[in-house]
Amino acid sequence: DPLFVIDGVIRDKEAFDLLEPYEIDQMSFLKDAATASIYGSAAGNGVVLVTTKGGTKNQKPIFNYQGSYAFSKPTQELFADRWDAIDDLDYQNAVARFQGTPLPNGEEEYAYFRDNKINYNVNDYIWQNPWNTKHSLSVNGGTDKVKYYVMGSFLAEEGSYVSLANKKFSLRSNLSVDLTKYITMNVNLDANQSNDKRFYWPFSDDDDQAVYDLYRCTFNAMKTTPFYSYLDGTPANTITDYPIYQDYGSWQGWNPVDQVVGNRYLKTRRRNLNGIVSFNINLDFITKGLSTKVMASYLGH
């Protein structure tokens, strides 16, 4: 990764990813000898310089709202939707022929699934079209001595599987005050909180929201096997309080639907607070064009 410098402070990629597009004023990509001379070996992969927005002198408050809503859906048929229960019966018989064992499915089994139109598709229970919505409200302005910019934003999104959700709240406040003719104080505050929720998946790290392996595992869910039953034990075509755990080869007691919609889940809350205080000192009274800057920053997770 390149080196990320946000408002003059070296930050990590996570801090860069948390930036909202609305709060960025300027962004530059540097990779040359001069850059290396300033930032050293850490700039070997280049430097990304980001300056966030600030206020404008002698300007009345200007409010700006931006919002969006987006959703997506697959352009191709999902892999697990490409076969049905009859195809599973054919597959089981084909395996038996290859192994030289009696066929497990005869006309009675075929008639049962065909005539009753039974097809237990895992995607009917756990798949959804993902969506996200973003909203931000900002105000900026200033007087002849004070400039300010304040922005609050909200993001909510849900993934392709139910029980995959994320919410993020962000707040930024950039204040600049001319203390004297020669000294300007800048106070930048950046705070955000993200709330991630996903179903428990034992084969992914707790911080992994992708759960790629689940998509592959849904291929193994047989269309002939119900995922739930009613109290009396009869198969159910909907989610009930009685999940059925079937063996799938080496998988013992596996129910991909209940794994996603059941009461096993992970909730992760992350909070970040970044504060920067700096003083720009004009030393023109010593030598024309001479200036210096003193900066302190605080980062909390």
Predicted stretch roles:
Residues 2, 7-34:
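Short acidic/polar hinge/loop motifs at secondary-structure boundaries
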Residues 2, 46, 54-162, 201-202:
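Residues embedded in well-ordered regular secondary structure
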Residues 17-22, 39-44, 164-166, 201:
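Short, glycine-/polar-rich solvent-exposed loops and beta-turns at beta-strand/coil boundaries
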Residues 27-28, 48-50, 277:
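Non-catalytic regulatory/gating segments with a bias toward low-complexity or hydrophobic composition
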Residues 32, 68-74, 155-159, 192-196, ...:
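Structural signature of outer-membrane beta-barrel domains
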Residues 63-65, 148-150, 185-187, 290-296:
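Transmembrane beta-strands of outer-membrane beta-barrel proteins
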Residues 75-105, 192-247, 301:
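A surface-exposed, glycine/aromatic-enriched loop/edge motif typical of exported proteins
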Residues 128-144, 153-155, 248-301:
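Outer-membrane beta-barrel transmembrane strands
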